[in-house]
């Protein structure tokens, strides 16, 4: 396997599991590579799907435009809401659950979600499970970034090459799922459209049949929960529909018809000009006879249209969302023979009906009264600020025919679920929307400090199709545009509920983690930060009209769900990132001081994390004395803010919050003061360790890894154990039964069998070549010996070893259970010995499955 860094890829961007999506790509790559099959190490490597790829039809596309399919028995009410969540989601998956080859071959429970590429060769083909025609099955259509290309990764050894699998570590978010076909016993019943889909543009239309109902999904849709008993899934069941051994490639003939009169579903849409990007059909005035033109995007109701298909007329009526009594109409009876569009009340005339014709990826809208007349965008300015739109006969000139082509975009009113969020500015990444309860009720931007001032509770109103955003500081106050303010500065305040539209916000998704917030009172008004400071120490937050595209506000936001319970309650070791062999330690010394100490696997270094749902923080209890809690001595007179183990006081300085970094480590902050975090210094303590402090400065030792105690990192299987620096060098035994490092010559003597003892929570490491022989610890700087470990003294701790995975390196450290301060390593002369653990390269190993 090569050591090349990951190339240009979107990697794990699609992941629905937060902790996986937050990892650096190199870290997740190491996590997946640790279980790579030995036989494939020299010929294959992990291959992420590149950002720009050559599709199965030899067309170069972005990964977001490659059509993927997933077969699943779960309905849209689950998948469109939650996305595809893998069976294994916990933060400490075991070896087997990250085994890509095992997953691809057997689809066992794992952190992966499987998809298959659409295969194109003049016609369209899709890998299809043989039981897809039994019961209720869904074929989901996916356009997602990143993922691992299984065939590219395993080459000729790919278990099921005809499946053309793309596997997604951490699953797939709902915003990357465009549609679903619902099949009952093999027959398509309806097509579900996902309004939350983040369209990358330039996609082929959703393939449909004129006889198939298309439905735009909504939360708890009454028809969106259809499933049969085979859809039930547990952590012990297999992902049966995507198992590569039970399917084959079939031609996808659904929707093959030359003229489909119903190419889109009924629902709410925006109609974008292909000629003038970001210009949409717009009802200029909310009156009967109001002119319809094209105008730049505003997010307003006047640019949203409700499509309803008439089966008798084989055409659509299109009414304004702003005023449901006004229909998109061509006034064909006007004495002036006008050809402009207007919004008229229902007349029953065919000039209010439109046939929609697919033109590749786009659409034409033909008037039913005269099908030669097509809606056409003009260059001429309208009197209302946009450009005129008329009906005209078909244009054949290839340079100008785009004026008759339109993109019909489903409108999504609800891109996020109700809940608590921080609102981070993307241009000023540490600035968030903040309400500090000041006398003028002003809301501003402030440096993130994770308190209730910066918590906002979003609640969706289905009548207004907009959100109310409630203050976490004062739950009766709403984020409000003070639209009646006399000041020219359009400020934002926190007011009690008035039922005014200026307290509602439409959320417009502009990227995978990017949103704009538009006020419902005037959808041209967007929320943004200026660079001007306020008297309260933050930045001015205001709304500004962006209808001319010239807003100078920082108006792009990342609306982040607030997560505090990152790890389950339980016992952990707390290892430092910079000093990987040092753990947080309390040895009951004078002054109850807590420090960092070389790992020795005793109760001094065991800490029980207990989550408090009210305070949304952890208490961390000592493993050596259950009455003592990890405490910041915030009242200490010393300038050095030390950590101590004190009895319970109820004070906030005994509560801690975790903040996950991209590499899987955590920052541990004190609840009493957000800026204060635990850091390890390089200063020695009188007790043989390193000093731990609580500080608000950027110490280098402030990242920590949590190792949950009692978990089994590797299965009871046979392995070769290769060095970190060279996987072709493995642990073997000499004729004197001492362990040595040697080149991998495929000898049976270099195969080792792990047998886990659940009582001792440690392994025996047996020779797979000679019965009863296993590893024996002798002492520091002595050989690891191969000897009989199945005799009367089988329980001797010298025969047992703990194995821990290093997230930083993607390798394993092997410790003696007899003396956990000692780890297996090797010398310059390739002797395998035990020495004080340091996490140095010569103490790190790969376990390669046989």
From Swiss-Prot:
Domain Ricin B-type lectin: start-end pairs = 267-409, 413-560, 564-707
Hydrolase recorded as keyword? no
Question: Which UniProt keywords are given for this protein, alphabetically ordered?
Answer: Apoptosis, Glycosyltransferase, NAD, Nucleotidyltransferase, Repeat, Transferase
Q: Could you say which enzyme class this protein belongs to? A: transferase
Specify one Pfam family. Scabin-like
What is a GO molecular function of this protein? nucleotidyltransferase activity
GO BP: apoptotic process; DNA ADP-ribosylation
Q: What is the effect of changing residue 165 to D?
A: Reduced cytotoxic activity
Q: Which InterPro entries match?
A: Pierisin-like_dom (IPR054695), Ricin_B-like_lectins (IPR035992), Ricin_B_lectin (IPR000772)
On whether Iron is a keyword of this UniProt record, the answer is: no
Catalytic reaction(s) noted: a 2'-deoxyguanosine in DNA + NAD(+) = an N(2)-(ADP-L-ribosyl)-2'-deoxyguanosine in DNA + nicotinamide + H(+)
Q: Which family does it belong to?
A: Belongs to the pierisin ADP-ribosyltransferase family.
Functionally, this protein is described as follows: ADP-ribosylates double-stranded DNA by targeting the N2 amino group of dG residues. Induces apoptosis in a range of human cell lines. May play a role in destroying cells during pupation and/or defense against parasites.
User: In its UniProt entry, what is this protein called?
Assistant: Pierisin
Species the sequence originates in: Pieris brassicae (White butterfly)
Q: What is the lineage of its organism?
A: Eukaryota, Metazoa, Ecdysozoa, Arthropoda, Hexapoda
């Amino acid at each position: 396997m090569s050591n090349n860094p990951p190339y240009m890829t979107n990697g794990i961007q699609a992941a629905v599991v937060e902790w996986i999506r937050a990892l650096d790509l190199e870290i997740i790559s190491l996590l997946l590579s640790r279980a790579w099959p030995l036989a494939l190490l020299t010929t294959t490597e992990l291959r992420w799907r590149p950002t720009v790829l050559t599709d199965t039809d030899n067309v170069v596309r972005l990964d977001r435009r490659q059509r993927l399919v997933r077969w699943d028995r779960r309905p849209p009410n689950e998948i469109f809401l939650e996305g595809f969540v893998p069976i294994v989601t916990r933060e400490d998956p075991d070896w087997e659950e990250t085994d890509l080859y095992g997953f691809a071959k057997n689809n066992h429970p794992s952190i992966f979600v499987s998809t298959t590429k659409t295969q194109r060769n003049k016609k369209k083909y899709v890998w299809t499970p043989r039981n897809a025609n039994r019961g209720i099955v869904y074929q989901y259509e996916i356009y997602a970034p990143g993922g691992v290309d299984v065939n590219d990764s395993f080459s000729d050894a790919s278990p099921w090459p005809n499946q053309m699998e793309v596997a997604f570590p951490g699953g797939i978010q709902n915003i990357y799922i465009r549609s679903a076909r619902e099949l009952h016993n093999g027959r398509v019943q309806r097509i579900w459209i996902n309004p939350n889909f983040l369209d990358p543009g330039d996609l082929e239309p959703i393939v449909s049949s004129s006889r198939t109902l298309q439905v735009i999904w909504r939360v708890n849709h009454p028809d969106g929960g259809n499933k049969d008993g085979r859809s039930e899934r547990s952590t012990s069941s297999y992902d049966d529909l995507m198992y590569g051994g039970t399917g084959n490639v079939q031609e996808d003939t659904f929707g093959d018809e030359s003229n489909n009169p119903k190419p889109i579903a009924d629902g709410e849409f925006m109609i974008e000009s292909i000629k003038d990007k970001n210009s949409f059909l717009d009802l200029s005035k909310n009156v009967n006879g109001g002119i319809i033109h094209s105008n730049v995007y505003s997010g307003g109701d006047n640019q949203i249209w409700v499509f309803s298909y008439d089966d008798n007329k084989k055409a659509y009526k299109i009414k304004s969302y702003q005023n449901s009594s006004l229909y998109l109409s061509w006034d064909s009876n006007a004495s002036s023979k006008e050809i402009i569009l207007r919004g008229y009340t229902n007349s029953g005339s065919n000039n209010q009906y439109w046939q929609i014709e697919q033109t590749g990826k786009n659409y034409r809208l033909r008037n039913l009264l005269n099908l030669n007349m097509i809606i056409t965008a003009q260059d001429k300015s309208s009197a209302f600020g946009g450009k005129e739109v008329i009906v005209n006969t078909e244009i054949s000139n290839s340079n100008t025919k785009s004026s008759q082509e339109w993109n019909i975009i489903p409108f999504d009113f609800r891109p996020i679920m109700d809940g608590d969020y921080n609102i981070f500015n993307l241009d000023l990444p540490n600035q968030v929307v903040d309400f500090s309860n000041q006398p003028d009720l002003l809301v501003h931007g402030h440096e993130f400090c994770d308190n209730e001032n910066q918590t906002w509770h979003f609640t969706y109103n289905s009548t207004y199709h907009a959100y109310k955003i409630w203050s976490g500081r004062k739950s009766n106050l709403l984020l409000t545009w003070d639209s009646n303010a006399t000041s020219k500065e359009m400020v934002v305040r926190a007011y009690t509920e008035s039922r005014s539209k200026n307290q509602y916000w439409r959320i417009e998704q502009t990227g995978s983690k990017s949103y704009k917030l538009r006020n419902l009172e005037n959808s041209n008004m967007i929320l943004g930060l200026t660079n001007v400071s306020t008297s309260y120490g933050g930045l001015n937050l205001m709304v500004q009209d962006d209808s001319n595209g010239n807003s100078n506000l920082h108006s792009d936001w990342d609306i982040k769900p607030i997560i505090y319970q990152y790890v389950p309650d339980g016992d952990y070791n707390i290892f430092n990132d910079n000093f990987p062999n040092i753990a947080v330690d309390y040895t009951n010394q004078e002054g109850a001081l807590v420090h960092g100490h070389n790992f020795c696997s005793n109760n001094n270094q065991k800490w029980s994390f207990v989550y408090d749902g009210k305070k949304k923080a952890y208490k961390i209890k000592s493993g050596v004395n259950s009455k003592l809690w990890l405490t910041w001595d915030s009242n200490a007179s010393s300038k050095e803010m030390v950590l101590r183990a004190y009895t319970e006081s109820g004070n906030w300085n005994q509560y801690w919050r975790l903040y996950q970094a991209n590499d899987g480590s955590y920052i541990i902050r004190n609840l009493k003061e957000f800026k204060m975090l635990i850091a390890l210094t390089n200063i020695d303590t009188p007790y043989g360790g390193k000093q731990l402090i609580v500080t608000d400065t950027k110490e280098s030792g402030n990242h920590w890894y949590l190792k949950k105690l009692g978990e089994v990192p590797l299965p009871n299987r046979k392995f070769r154990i290769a060095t970190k620096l060279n996987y072709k060098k493995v642990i073997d035994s000499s004729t004197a039964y001492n362990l040595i490092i040697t080149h991998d010559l495929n000898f049976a003597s270099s195969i080792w069998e792990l047998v886990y003892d659940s009582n001792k929570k440690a392994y025996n490491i047996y020779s797979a070549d000679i019965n009863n022989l296993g590893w024996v610890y002798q002492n520091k700087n002595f050989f690891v010996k191969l000897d009989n470990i199945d005799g009367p003294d089988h329980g001797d701790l010298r025969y047992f070893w703990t194995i821990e995975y290093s997230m930083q390196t993607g390798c394993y450290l092997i410790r003696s259970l007899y003396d956990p301060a000692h780890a297996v390593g090797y010398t310059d002369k390739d002797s395998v010995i035990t020495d004080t653990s340091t996490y140095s390269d010569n103490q790190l190993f790969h376990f390669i499955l046989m």
